């Protein structure tokens, strides 16, 4: 591990020198900056580790020479504290050296669809959208709507949006799956608890992929943007539908005001969907081990239950139950995301040690 960290540190400073040498090529600068950033956390942690090891060495030398009992007592307490800090830092370094998901630093495209439960499923899809929006706001990220299909009684039959921000996908990629809600609908006169579901899909936004997406392979259609009940909300054909004929991937964008902006947004979405389709086909070939490795899991599995009467949320993947549903629906999904990421990292570390 430490040989690898030493190589990373040397590479990090070599990149800094190269950037300081006055490179004018913007693409080259961007590439170097990205590489530098990918090394930064590990290098900073490693240098802190080296500093603590040096402090511990000096302290041990002091303990060998010191005879004053009060000083010895203080030094031994500090030695114990340093050893604990070093042990914790070693664990952090092992995590930082785990294989990285190459998409972690990307923006995330989230699609939510009301599923079982009809109107109540759609209303819950709307609640999930608000939850993710508030979480994004707390992280300083931007939310951009791509498509909305309003539900007849509120919420959304379907909604698609992009969350843009540093490492957004790394935090939200584990949200894909079936989200189940248990509560009494407003229209329920007998006070009975109903169970409904919404399905979430989280994808990394792709700017470019190895697969060659050519405009001549894309069918381009325009139509009127529509609001609730299918009513037209403008008289221009600003909404865009793109169909990639070789893969039969279809995307739409209607939330931008101009056709040009919707076309740009739809193209990015199309590239992302094609990338995802290719990746899913590859995962099927490689089997479940690869799925587990990147931690994205089965999109059809029930991942979480939101129980309103008991103010309880349970994430079934790690057996985590939190009695703070009200806070979570107000955007505090970090209460679930952080333990989930920690558990995934723990499993990855255990896998490496086998």
UniProtKB/Swiss-Prot annotation:
SUPFAM superfamilies: Release factor. Belongs to the prokaryotic/mitochondrial release factor family. GO terms for molecular function: translation release factor activity, codon specific. It is found in: Cytoplasm. Peptide chain release factor 1 directs the termination of translation in response to the peptide chain termination codons UAG and UAA. The gene is prfA. One of its GO terms (cellular component) is cytoplasm. The modification N5-methylglutamine is found at residue 231. It comes from the Bacteria. The keyword Nucleus does not apply. This is Peptide chain release factor 1. Keywords: Cytoplasm, Methylation, Protein biosynthesis. PANTHER family: LD18447P. SMART domains: PCRF. It comes from Acholeplasma laidlawii (strain PG-8A). Its main location: cytoplasm.
């Amino acid at each position: 591990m430490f040989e690898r960290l030493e190589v990373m540190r040397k590479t990090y400073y070599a990149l800094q020198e190269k950037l300081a040498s006055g490179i004018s090529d913007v693409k080259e600068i961007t590439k170097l900056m990205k590489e530098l950033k990918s090394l930064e956390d590990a290098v900073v942690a490693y240098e802190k580790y080296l500093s603590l090891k040096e402090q511990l060495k000096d302290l041990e030398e002091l303990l060998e020479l010191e005879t004053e009992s009060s000083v010895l007592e203080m030094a031994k307490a500090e030695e114990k504290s340093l050893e604990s800090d070093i042990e914790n830092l070693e664990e952090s370094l092992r995590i930082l050296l785990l294989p990285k998901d190459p998409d972690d630093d990307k923006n995330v495209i989230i699609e939510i669809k009301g599923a079982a439960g009809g109107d109540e499923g759609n209303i819950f899809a709307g609640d999930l959208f608000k939850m993710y929006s508030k979480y994004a706001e707390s992280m300083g990220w931007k939310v951009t709507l791509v498509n909305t299909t309003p539900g007849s009684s509120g919420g959304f039959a379907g909604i698609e949006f992009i969350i843009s921000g540093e490492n957004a996908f790394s935090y939200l990629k584990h949200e894909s799956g079936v989200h189940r809600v248990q509560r009494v609908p407003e229209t329920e006169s007998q006070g009975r608890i109903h169970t409904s579901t919404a399905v979430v899909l989280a994808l990394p936004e792709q700017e470019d992929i190895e697969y060659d997406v050519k405009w001549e392979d894309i069918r381009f259609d325009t139509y009127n943007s529509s609001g609730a009940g299918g009513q037209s909300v403008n008289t221009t054909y600003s909404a865009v539908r793109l169909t990639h004929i070789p893969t039969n991937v279809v995307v739409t964008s209607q939330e931008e005001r101009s056709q040009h902006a919707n076309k740009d947004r739809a193209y990015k979405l199309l590239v992302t969907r094609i990338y995802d389709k290719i990746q899913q086909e590859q995962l099927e070939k490689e089997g479940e081990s690869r799925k587990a490795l990147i931690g994205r899991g089965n999109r059809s599995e029930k991942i979480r239950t939101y129980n309103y009467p008991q103010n309880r949320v349970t994430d079934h993947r790690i057996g985590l139950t939190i009695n703070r549903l009200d806070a979570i629906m107000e955007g505090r999904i970090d209460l679930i995301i952080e333990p989930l990421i920690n558990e995934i990292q723990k499993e990855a570390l255990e896998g490496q040690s086998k």
